[in-house]
Amino acid sequence: ISVFVPDLTSVGGSRDEKALEFVDVLRNDLLNAGLFDVHDAKGIPLDGSGSINFQAFFNAGAEELIKGEYQSSGGRIQIAARLFDVAQEKDLLGRSYEATPGKVREAAHRFASAVMKELTGIDGFFNSKIVFVSGTGQNRDLYMMDYDGRDIKRLTSHRSLLLSPHCSSDGTKIVFSSDKVWSQNIYVLSLVPRIEERRLTRALKLDQSPEWSPDGSKIAYSENGDIFVSNPNGSGAVNLTHSPAIDVSPTWSPDGREIAFVSDRGGVPQIYVMNSDGTNVRRITSGGYDTDPSWSPNFGVNKIAFVRVEGSEANIFTISPDGTDEQKLTRGAGRNENPSWSPDGHYITFASTRNGAKNIYIMYLNGENQRPLTRDGGKSFPTWCR
């Protein structure tokens, strides 16, 4: 979809760089979606009255046009933006925002999400967050950033082997594992009303790869090579697998009725699916070494992303829960690991060493439009949050 996004027009005539950031963020959001061909519309004039010369935009190849204006007053910025269908010369969508200079990016993300919903029917993810691990070895901590890699904030001070964060479906809590106190244990970090951390497991065992159930009522995790499910406070833990094999990395289906996980019960690690009570276990992959599953939160997509180790490389695949329709999303580019789905199930964030250092990337669910979010290395285990 060809979208032209001219700079905002100042109503009062004065230039405000923070207000102009709105368009920069908006253009970047639409590019990151991978569904739009975005243009800045330079050289296409408005007529003298300030109305839109639709014919000029149509001749330039525009299908959609976003036009906006702003006014700065008293330390606040008022922004009005509209989406037009160029061929029909039709007003499709309009939004107005009043923001402090520090909130202009948030307003742009909100408008980009509204535009994406209007043009594609897909909920925009531009106001979402990505939580990730930064650091190496025994000096790792949890951070949060905007989905586009901006506004990075540190969440923990563990300086330990911190691994596998996962956000609750409402985005208010993060579960992860850390060896901050002796062995790997499960922790929960609450983000509202304030940042508060609780340790859920306390045994001298290997507790890792936790994940919230979709309704937030349970946490699945692995302990010493078995899959367990507990209440959010760590009580009532139940062993689902009781297997002599190593079973790790549980991930819930969108309705919470099934769990996919990794097991080497067949000789090498493969992806299996079972009911959430541990019954009806079946294998769904047959590659050489498959691990790190992540089930899409959207039944409309209903795919499981996973990692297949292929020699010195590791690549991300998707597969249907019944073991059909396997697709390779990354190829020939280092180690691609830790896939995590966007809340709408149409995008995947992941970690990759394709350029040497390990950084966070995003891509569309079919593997197209792979784009880096970080560039300074030492980043791993991204998890998408609302």
Spans of model-derived segments:
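Amphipathic beta-strand/beta-sheet edge segments enriched in Tyr/Trp
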Residues: 50-114
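Short loop/turn segments that connect beta-strands within beta-propeller blades
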Residues: 87, 146-150, 190-194, 231-235, ...
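A flexible loop/linker signature enriched in serine peptidases of the S9 family
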Residues: 123, 134-141, 157-160, 177-186, ...
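Residue-level detector of Asp-centered blade-edge/turn motifs that repeat once per structural unit
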Residues: 124-126, 169-170, 214-215, 254-255, ...
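Hydrophobic beta-strand positions that form the internal "hydrophobic ladder"
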Residues: 130, 174, 216-219, 259-260, ...
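Conserved beta-strand position repeated across blades of beta-propeller domains
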Residues: 166, 211, 251, 294-296, ...
